[in-house]
Amino acid sequence: MNTVVRNAIVSDSFDDLRSKQVRFLEEAHKIGFVNVLLWSDALIESITGRLPKFPQEERLYYLQSLRYVDRIRVISNINDPHSLPLPVWDELNPVGWVVDQASDNPQKRLFCASVGMGYQVIPETDLLGFPFRRNDALEAPSGRKKVIVTGCYDWLHSGHVRFFEEVAGLGDLFVVVGSDANVHLLKGASHPMFSQDERRYMVQAIRFVRAALISTGKGWMDAEPEIELIRPDIYAVNEDGDKPEKRRFCVEHGLEYVVLKRLPRAGLPRRESAILRGF
């Protein structure tokens, strides 16, 4: 039951957001404007019998940062995950519920048929891989300063998003994600948890990021080849990423070096990837 949908309705908790969910949102965005019905903390507890891993405000902030999400409404008034609150969005027309193949079931199809709503299933095969988001960021300068940040981003979280948001205020943000080989070299045998392509994909999905690349160098300055390519004006780090090698490189190459405090967005908890790996 696939029908024409220009406004895609997506309903989920989006608790502990991972790449597969982001891939789903990207594919939904190809169908139409993505309108997320985000489950409240109380609704998650009602449906699953447990509190969410991540609180509502943090889940909302993360979703708002994704370039594939157009609007979000927090909901708490459905009896089960196989229905939507009515009216869904009065001003949206035509509208349809978009689900992935694993979430498709007769109850959802019946609900949509009963209220005259479109319904579309995204096949699992469409969610495979981590597409590279091509853009003209390197060839077509915007007139703003270029800012580069580097890191592993092995478990992207709200703290990273806040860092990207702050840095993007300084200029066009380019993120260089550490290669698998270099992360392994710097952090040890159990790193990284996620592949370089998956980590780059998650970073490039953040709307504050103009472009994301994978490093091709080695050591703390593994992004040196990418810096030569991008030619940034500013190298930004947080307190944890402040290294003598980076300071020296910026002095030698005439880059402004900016160190930001490692602070979460107001009202959100401080997050660390090392802790989340065991969350």
Enumerate the language-model features and the residues they cover.
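Nucleotidyltransferase catalytic core that binds NTPs
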Residues: 1-279
